Amino acid sequence: MSSDRACMLCGIVQTTNEFTRDGCPNCQGIFEEASVSAIECTSPSFEGLVGMCKPTKSWVAKWISVEQYVPGMYAIKVDGRLPVEVVDLLPHYKPRDGSQVD
């Protein structure tokens, strides 16, 4: 059984232990402001993986909206819903579960 999870906000994939110990390297400040834990904002259900070495120089990073994030493995689609406390802080939030169509 895999212990990998993906952040529902940025899509980075890490182990459950990494999220528990360190939080999300991209979104932890938002989670703290919303008074929620990183685990509440992650999902074990995700699809597709993209490795980002240089997100600022990658067209794929731009396509999946991770160009401003740290290098790492990112999920293309993440199932689940962020806590309302987080969504309320983000006026331009786009879910990573594919439910919002541009």
Swiss-Prot record:
Keywords: Centromere, Chromosome, Metal-binding, mRNA processing, Nucleus, Transcription, Zinc, Zinc-finger. InterPro entries: RPABC4/Spt4, Spt4, Spt4/RpoE2_Znf, Spt4_sf. GO terms for molecular function: protein-containing complex binding; rDNA binding; RNA polymerase II complex binding; single-stranded RNA binding; zinc ion binding. It is found in: Nucleus; Chromosome, Centromere. It holds the Pfam family Spt4. Its main location: nucleus. One of its GO terms (biological process) is regulation of transcription-coupled nucleotide-excision repair. SUPFAM superfamilies: RNA polymerase subunits (SSF63393). The keyword Plastid does not apply. The keyword RNA-binding does not apply. SMART domains: Spt4 (SM01389). GO terms for cellular component: DSIF complex; kinetochore; mating-type region heterochromatin; rDNA heterochromatin. Gene3D superfamilies: 3.30.40.210. A zinc finger (C4-type) spans 7-27. PANTHER family: SUPPRESSOR OF TY 4, TRANSCRIPTION ELONGATION FACTOR SPT4. The SPT4-SPT5 complex mediates both activation and inhibition of transcription elongation, and plays a role in pre-mRNA processing. This complex seems to be important for the stability of the RNA polymerase II elongation machinery on the chromatin template but not for the inherent ability of this machinery to translocate down the gene. Belongs to the SPT4 family. Component of the SPT4-SPT5 complex. Interacts with RNA polymerase II. This is Transcription elongation factor SPT4. The lineage of its organism: Eukaryota, Fungi, Dikarya, Ascomycota, Saccharomycotina. The gene is SPT4.
